[in-house]
Amino acid sequence: MSRRGTAEKRPAMPDPIYQNRLVNMLVNRIVKNGKKSLAYSILYKAMKDIKQSTQKNPLSVIRQAVRRTTPNVAVKARRRGGSTYQVPVEIKSAQGRALAIRWILNAAKKRNGRSMAFKLSSEIIDAARQTGNAIRKREETHRMAEANRAFAHFR
């Protein structure tokens, strides 16, 4: 086990246009092969699509989508007596937000559509309306935690 302390959590930097940390977190998850400018253009196009289709502030729609996708509990595998139990554990807000962003992006990648910007915008809109695959993933996680509630004392 490491003798060093845990690393300090660095705050996420805000993005250059909207000055928002959540937007920058999304961009950092979109980046592939170091192409951050492409990730920014994908997200900003998606935000433009959100503005056109919902007539609302895209930042508030993204916040709502992430908030509605954020899980409260998850299951962790714990070995006990030769068998593995799925133990429900509460999730901290930062970890929940990271999971929500990951689920939204994965659901957007799996969609079939024209461009990543279009797929991302439609997934964000669906998540804000509490539909879509990211919300389904959250519900599935909560169902798993509820089903394995009997093992909550194994923490």
From Swiss-Prot:
**Keyword Zinc-finger annotated:** no
**A GO biological-process term:** translation
Which CDD domains does the record associate with it? uS7_Chloroplast (cd14871)
InterPro entries registered for this protein in UniProt: Ribosomal_uS7, Ribosomal_uS7_bac/org-type, Ribosomal_uS7_CS, Ribosomal_uS7_dom, Ribosomal_uS7_dom_sf
Recorded GO cellular component terms are: chloroplast; small ribosomal subunit
Query: What SUPFAM superfamilies does the record point to?
Result: Ribosomal protein S7
Keywords on record:
Chloroplast, Plastid, Ribonucleoprotein, Ribosomal protein, RNA-binding, rRNA-binding
Name the Gene Ontology molecular function terms of this record.
Answer: rRNA binding; structural constituent of ribosome
Entry's Pfam families? Ribosomal_S7 (PF00177)
- Locations listed in the record: Plastid, Chloroplast
Assigned protein family: Belongs to the universal ribosomal protein uS7 family.
What is said about its interaction partners and assembly? Answer: Part of the 30S ribosomal subunit.
Describe the task this protein carries out.
Answer: One of the primary rRNA binding proteins, it binds directly to 16S rRNA where it nucleates assembly of the head domain of the 30S subunit.
NCBIfam families, A to Z: rpsG_bact (TIGR01029)
Query: What name appears for this protein in its UniProt entry?
Result: Small ribosomal subunit protein uS7c
Give the species: Zygnema circumcarinatum (Green alga)
